[in-house]
């Protein structure tokens, strides 16, 4: 076996501008040799996060390490058939330690967000998760996301935090996914075993060959290897998001990231973020029913790219639910309804009927609750 080639084998390359990103940090960068968590590598990553937040950008951290932290708090558990229950118990014990580790580096609040598979496949939970993360970013906090191992079951697990990071990146409409690992980037073969491994500093299109040559996890504390990172890059790329693989153990490499310089692997997306989202909005199944709007609202949507507010709504047809994909149609006394747009609705049909024609500030009074000022946000809408 040979050592891993030095980071200098990866040429330095510029990172395109971004305004919102996800940083994924694996257990191998946070676990201490004797058990528990270590700030050794987390400190440089925290500096990277702080520098970008100070510059006006937004970041979400997806962090592993709860199980590793929990393992250090109690005597070693015996091997048994209750492996899942044991892991869930360790995650419950270690989650507070993990959040405390990150909080110590920042003078802003750190918010803990635990997600499950169900949260991301259910329309209403998906919308709620997205709204929560966006609001946390708007408030200037630092969200730290982890899979909720305490309640997840095997058949409903997201599987690893690499894939969770890609899903979160799409959830918040990020432009970049940074994956900190313990290897310098992607190689033509596993550099731990092959001295002739060549660095791949840029990948335009991920191929089955790339996935095949990616090694499995060699860490004793994590669940994801290079293959899961490439699978995550595929997910992110389908949403128009760049993925950057880099060595989180190298201070020079991490400091370079703060100056928008990468020594690692950049994996390009398969389309632009706007194209990916607009394609999905245009082709996703539409629920029966529609929202009928007046001419003023139609002009605001078509000419100004505005969100749909309750003031321009005439009525709602059908029995759609919050989070459904619905049609938006114009209606006037002289013309029948004509489809104008489609989008993800923030309120149910019953709620829309109650707030139709009112000002956004009156939603709370009329309903007793609010999901925001818009019925369909412009980011969730596409013109037909």
UniProtKB/Swiss-Prot annotation:
Task: List, in alphabetical order, the GO biological process terms annotated in this UniProt record.
Answer: L-proline biosynthetic process
Principal cellular location given in the protein's record: cytoplasm
CDD domains from the UniProt entry:
AAK_G5K_ProB, PUA_G5K
Give me the residues that bind ATP, please. Answer: 24, 181-182, 223-229
Q: In which pathway does it act?
A: Amino-acid biosynthesis; L-proline biosynthesis; L-glutamate 5-semialdehyde from L-glutamate: step 1/2
Its EC number(s): 2.7.2.11
Q: State the family named in the UniProt similarity comment for this chain.
A: Belongs to the glutamate 5-kinase family.
**Annotated protein name in UniProt:** Glutamate 5-kinase
Residues that, per the record, bind substrate = 64, 149, 161
Pfam families hit by this protein: AA_kinase, PUA
Protein source organism: Xylella fastidiosa (strain Temecula1 / ATCC 700964)
Function, please? Catalyzes the transfer of a phosphate group to glutamate to form L-glutamate 5-phosphate.
Write down the NCBIfam families for this protein, in alphabetical order: proB
Q: Where is the PUA domain?
A: 288-370
State the compartments where it is located: Cytoplasm
